[in-house]
């Protein structure tokens, strides 16, 4: 059962809540998520299971696609509706033109300060833990890239946005900073993740669907097998003898199986589609197995 289960995370659950639930359903402790979703958020939460947990390192900067609802009129401590108001509530009447002009500042590459209430670490502690103790937290800005930021709808003080962004981008910060730029305050009211890396919403199962599959002994139906993960990495097909050598740490060439891939990493895969290892280039046309399955 090595692979990824894509969950449609329900609102109100932490990502760790979902991991614990799937551990019980799949009857294994080897489950982890590939990127936190806030409790108020729903949508795509990919979970690595069994030996595929070894591949999590390759997903840390996966691009994301979100659809979010921003409420203008006041800001909050967490930059979303779960936080305490930090500004006086004001009546807001924005035009689409005003909003489009402000959105232009949040497209492309820029420095973004993460919310104080986040999973970022400060001297070894999660910043949200410090914030809950009323300790002052101001995280350093980080470079993010927003490839697309589209205004889908504007009604009253609510704006629906769609964003395609780099890993590590906070939609809560975009909402908060947008309110600051417009001088009226704002926070994130709703958030749905439509895609995370190669995983999309149409692949996602609810926890109830996953439980039903497990009850019918059909849990593998919900798993994207390890051999199909990381499609951006070129595949090098190997026979069983070479596969055994790679599992023992032996370097392997890309040819004669295929021409040298223009990639730092390749996947060593058997003819039956099983992932043997992820290889990292060490010499032209020679790869070292950095992760062995």
Swiss-Prot record:
GO molecular function: RNA binding; tRNA pseudouridine(55) synthase activity
CDD domains (alphabetical): PseudoU_synth_EcTruB
Active site per UniProt: 38 (nucleophile)
EC number in record: 5.4.99.25
Isomerase is among the record's keywords: yes
InterPro entries, per the entry: PsdUridine_synth_cat_dom_sf (IPR020103), PsdUridine_synth_N (IPR002501), tRNA_psdUridine_synth_TruB (IPR014780), TruB_C (IPR032819)
Keyword DNA-binding applies: no
Entry's Gene Ontology BP terms: mRNA pseudouridine synthesis; tRNA pseudouridine synthesis
Keywords: Isomerase, tRNA processing
Pfam families linked: TruB_C_2 (PF16198), TruB_N (PF01509)
Catalyzed chemical reaction(s): uridine(55) in tRNA = pseudouridine(55) in tRNA
Biological role: Responsible for synthesis of pseudouridine from uracil-55 in the psi GC loop of transfer RNAs.
HAMAP family, alphabetized: TruB_bact
Stated family: Belongs to the pseudouridine synthase TruB family. Type 1 subfamily.
Name of the protein described by the UniProt record: tRNA pseudouridine synthase B
Organismal lineage: Bacteria, Pseudomonadati, Acidobacteriota, Terriglobia, Bryobacterales
Gene: truB
């Amino acid at each position: 059962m090595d692979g990824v289960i894509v969950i449609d995370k329900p609102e109100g659950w932490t990502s760790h809540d979902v991991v614990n639930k799937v551990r019980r359903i799949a009857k294994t402790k080897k489950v982890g998520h590939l990127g936190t979703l806030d409790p108020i958020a729903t949508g795509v939460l990919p979970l690595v299971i069994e030996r595929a947990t070894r591949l999590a390192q390759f997903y840390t900067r996966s691009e994301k696609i979100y659809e979010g609802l921003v409420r203008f009129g006041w800001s909050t401590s967490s930059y979303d509706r779960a936080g305490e108001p930090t500004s006086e509530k004001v009546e807001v009447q924005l035009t689409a033109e005003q909003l489009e002009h402000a959105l232009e500042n949040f497209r492309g590459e820029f420095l973004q300060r993460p919310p104080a209430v986040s999973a970022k670490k400060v001297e070894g502690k999660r910043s949200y833990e410090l914030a809950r103790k009323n300790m002052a937290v101001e995280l350093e800005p980080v470079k993010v890239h927003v490839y697309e930021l589209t205004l889908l709808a504007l009604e009253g003080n609510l704006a629906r946005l769609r964003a395609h962004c780099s890993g590590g981008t906070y939609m809560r910060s975009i909402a908060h900073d947008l309110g600051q730029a417009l001088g009226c305050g704002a926070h994130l009211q709703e958030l749905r993740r439509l895609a995370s890396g190669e995983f999309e919403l149409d692949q996602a199962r609810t926890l109830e669907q996953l439980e039903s599959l497990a009850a019918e002994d059909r849990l593998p139906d919900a798993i994207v097998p390890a051999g199909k993960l990381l499609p951006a990495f070129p595949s090098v097909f190997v026979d069983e003898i070479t596969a055994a050598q790679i599992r023992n740490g032996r370097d392997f060439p890309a040819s004669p199986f295929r021409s040298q891939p223009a990639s730092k990493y390749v996947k060593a895969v058997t003819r039956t589609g099983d992932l043997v290892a992820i290889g990292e280039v060490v010499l032209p046309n020679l790869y070292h197995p950095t992760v062995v399955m």
